[in-house]
Curated annotation (Swiss-Prot):
Source species of the chain: Pongo abelii
Gene designation: TRIM44
Protein name: Tripartite motif-containing protein 44
Disordered, as annotated region: 1-25, 68-165, 309-344
Coiled-coil intervals, chain numbering: 290-325
Pfam families xrefs: zf-B_box
Amino acid sequence: MASGVGAAFEELPHDGTCDECEPDEAPGAEEVCRECGFCYCRRHAEAHRQKFLSHHLAEYVHGAQAWTPPADGEGAGKEEAEVKVEQEREIESEAGEESESEEESESEEESETEEESEDESDEESEEDSEEEMEDEQESEAEEDNQEEGESEAEGETEAESEFDPEIEMEAERVAKRKCPDHGLDLSTYCQEDRQLICVLCPVIGAHQGHQLSTLDEAFEELRSKDSGGLKAAMIELVERLKFKSSDPKVTRDQMKMFIQQEFKKVQKVIADEEQKALHLVDIQEAMATAHVTEILADIQSHMDRLMTQMAQAKEQLDTSNESAEPKAEGDEEGPSGASEEEDT
């Protein structure tokens, strides 16, 4: 192994082994550095070449001079330069490692941030899709409910129009205001049958020869009749019940039968009063209908007179216009003829 580098030492012959390996286990040298003069095996030569890029290694030849020691100043300066270069490389390598580690950490943080943003966007998209689905379901449910409500409303209106009791009653009232035999308005009252009839019933109908009256006369007559029959019947019923209940000979069954008979009499009086009231209502409705019919007839007659007067006025206006046209033509020809005579 070589030793002594510098002016104080003489160059010793190399022993032909690697100066980097352990002396006891050092293999044979294969390359030698021309700058530092050390001999290396294949492995250490490659490491020395990568560590000191400015050094030049050559094949080791046993017995040849491996290295010429430079001057003291030159060697020291070269060694200092090599050390400085090595330190700079180490600093650069450390800075590169730090920058790489920082870049890796930044890239990891960016990737984590991107993953978090992707997760958040996925969650937001899922929430949005769920909200859209819920909105669609709600809108569909509202549309279905609206359609059902419309169909129900239509069904109700149809049902009301078909089964509305007020409409049916109005139709019945309108039908009652017409004569069932002749289809005319009920404008006369038959005293014998106590019935409303039309004007044709006493002429060609079933009421020929009967005593008749107007609707106003029949209404006043029915309304002026004494309506105390119901009150008198109730008073008589109370008196008879008192007398019957005070008789000790009357059994319980006889008392029940008596009460039923008396109440049937009262019910008949009530039914007669009901028919009388309904009859008055019918006569009043017939009077109103006849009155409206008279008013409509008067309006129609007035309209007919107005239309006739308008037609006559238009005819007179047309006649006056026709008579005025020839006169205007003659006036125009007169001055022209006079001017022609003057010219001649």
